[in-house]
Every structure is written in structure tokens, then in C-alpha cells.
Amino acid sequence: IYNTNLIIDNQGKVIGKHRKLVPTWAEKLTWTSGDGSSLKVYDTAVGPIGTLACGENTNTLARFTLLAQGELIHIANYISLPVAPPDYNMAEAIKIRAAAHSFEGKLFTIVSCSTISEEIKDALREDVPNVDELLTRKNSAFSGFIGPTGAVIGEPLIDEEGIVYAEIDLEKCIQPKQMHDILGHYNRFDIFDLRVNIAPTRKITFVDNHEDFNKR
């Protein structure tokens, strides 16, 4: 509802959430922006997990913020985009972004992407007779695993609904970091300085005689 990813642990407990920082394109008709308070990495039984939603996986600063907190497993979720320009390969674009983050951070990325099912098209058909023409196209969705070398692990799903399985070994993040660790020896923090505002944004504050109601 709020353009938000939930982090759920292996006990079924919600341990965190991340609201998309900037709604993309038509999303602006429904949602507003998130804030830096949810740019967090969570310790889980399988390793440190961070997440970003859809197009914000292109945001280099947001991605680095997660990497700097020790992220080793990145969750990236996307929507299928059948309304993209005809020459735009959405599946490839998703894979490129996931591979870039995995290669830069020397970590694993798990990608999940929605698909346009026949049920969705059937639900729209009465009001949108040309729904097949509008929503049927190849290479609109990619779901799969990307390793720390930027290579795909296992068999991804392209334009299909299903579950992708792959085995990941966090020790495989070590050797690549020995070559290029942008969080340590392979960076210059005497030159670069990233500041991140993690304060929750308050959309509105009610006051009466200059007294903050929220402090009562």
C-alpha cells in the first residue's frame, strides 16, 4: 500500500521495512516519498540483508549507504513494465542493475519481479478491450540471483511467475573484496564524504500557541 518492502525473518517476524525514497513515473499519482530512516541493513540468520525498491536500485548513493552498513545480501524488487518503449528490454535492465550492485559491493543480489498474468489481463478485458496489445510483450520481467562477480546464479525466470532457487555462500564475497573493497582499502574517504539524513520525515506538525502537540 505504501510502496514499502518488508523484511521478515525466518521466524515470521517483521524486523524492518523500507519505503521507496522516490516514487517513479506514474507512482507519483499514488505515493509520496520515503525518507532515510529506513535505509538500514538487518542481521538475519542467513546474513546481513538490505533492500531497495525498483528504480531506486539505480541510486548509487542509496546503494552505497546499504553497503557501508555491511550488506552482503541485497533484495531488489521490480514491477513488470510492458508499457516501456518498444526497444527497451526491461528484463535486461533489471539484470544490469542487479549485477552492477553485486559487482561493486561484492555481494549477492536476489531479484524478484512481478509479471502480467492472464488473470490480470482477464480482469481488465471488459474495460480495456485491447489489454492483450497493451500488456503483452517479451522481456518485461527478470527474477533471479546475482553473485559477487556480477554473474547470474542458477536459472532465472523471464516473464514467468514462479520461485527461483539458488545456493549462496557468503564466503565467496571475501576474495573479490581482496581485489576491490570500495568500503575499505579500495576507496579514499579522505576525499569522499557521504552524509545520510536518517531522521524520519514528518509530513505535518500541528501547533497551538507555538506549543508542539506532538510533545504532549
Task: Identify the meaning behind each predicted range.
Residues 48, 54-164:
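CN hydrolase (nitrilase-like) catalytic-core segments centered on the catalytic cysteine
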Residues 38-72, 173-216:
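Cysteine/selenocysteine-centered motifs that mediate thiol-based redox chemistry or coordinate metal-sulfur cofactors
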Residues 3-7, 40, 143-145, 164-166:
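Short beta-strand scaffold segments in enzyme catalytic cores
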Residues 7-13, 100:
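Basic phosphate/pyrophosphate-binding loop/patch that engages nucleotide-derived ligands
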Residues 20-34, 160-179:
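A short, polar/charged loop-to-alpha-helix boundary motif
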Residues 10-11, 45, 148:
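Short, ordered coil/turn segments that flank beta-strands lining enzyme active or ligand-binding pockets
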Residues 5, 16-18:
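Beta-strand scaffold of nucleotide-dependent catalytic cores
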